Amino acid sequence: IKNPIEETDITQGKTLYAVSKLAGEELVKAYQYEYKSFNFSILRYFNTYGPFQVAQFVIPKFIFRVQRNLPPIINGDGSQERSYNFSQDTARATVDALFSSKANNKTLNIGNSSEPINLIDLANLIIKKCGKENKIFPSMNKNFSNTDREDSREINYRYCDTSLAERILDYKVRTKLEKGIEKVIETNIIPE
């Protein structure tokens, strides 16, 4: 997969979850083809995180473990790179798309393409922000044992090109990764 991912790139779902999202997009487009007065906006969210998110996802999962003096567990070698987008920025883009006719019948990437980070650096950043530096270290699960993930389906690099959303919605990332992680830690509520 080439990065950054553009809206026009060929999509390749590797999981049921990914394929179901792509099928939903096609269903919406087919509906609009059938009923011309129907307008849509498809927003592709890239790695949204924020306060109150369950510990199923990487950022709250790492914080949840570190706050309990447990090492964050990294599946794979830790070189996997993502770019994370704070929930308030995602929500703002969603509302903007709802009220902008410029977004009609468009597919837009919503994410943070300016701060890609690998999982080792993300784990160490969270350890530092939780005040556990030099006390807790990431644990590696290189063979993906006891996880819902598979090495063969792992995507090593994934972040998006948001230039179309920037042009159409005046979209911009307002919350940098470090600040967003601090906000999640401050809420101190991560459901299991």
PLM segments and residue spans:
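Active-site helix-initiating loop/hinge in glycosyltransferases
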Residues: 50, 54, 83-86
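Catalytic helix-loop patch of NAD(P)-dependent Rossmann-fold dehydrogenases
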Residues: 1-42, 53-55
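C-terminal substrate-binding subdomain of Rossmann-fold SDR/epimerase-dehydratase oxidoreductases
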Residues: 66-192
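Conserved SDR Rossmann-fold cofactor-binding beta-strand/turn motif
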Residues: 44-49
